[in-house]
Amino acid sequence: MTVKQFLLSVIIVSVFASCSAQKTSVMQQVDVLGQDQTIEDSVIRRLRDNNDLVIAYAVENFAWVRSISYLIIAKKNDEWMGYQYHVNLMRNQPQASVPGNINPAEVNKASCDSLLQYITQTKAWNIKGDSGQNFCPDGNNGCNINDAAGARLWIITQKGLVNPSYYAPEFFEECCPDKDRALFLSVTKKIQDIVAVQGISK
């Protein structure tokens, strides 16, 4: 083995160890914080059961066209997979929460590893969300919007989950900035960039 080959092998091992450590760190934090929460959607539950870590961005529409659209990345061992998943919640439509409505999406491993590193560095599992109320904590009374979509960040392990949500996060971040919401938008934008999809509402 040449010196160059040796150095390359050391770099590869170091990168792998770093990614594994980040995954372990995120999983440990989520395991502790999210033990009392459950997942109602059977498709998301299946992803949880079949992977070590699931990270997802969901756009939730509950006003006119009731639906949830997910962009998902999932890690099992050292492999990442991406998915697009849409659930139609309209009563006069067939139930959409079935395996056939989840579609694989190409994802870049380096980008997924970078997202995991970002989540670890920023401790994104501590994002609180607005819980459907108190959208503008600074009391800006001119900051109002109706019938907008909500957004949710899912970080799921086999033992727990965190899933902070914000109503119209881009709108409210513009008129009354909030540190947690800004981090939420930063993380979910990275997920959108990784799982390229056409036609998902923001």
Locations of the language-model features?
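Bacterial Sec-dependent N-terminal signal peptides
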Residues: M1-Q29
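Function-determining sites in protein domains
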Residues: S20-K202
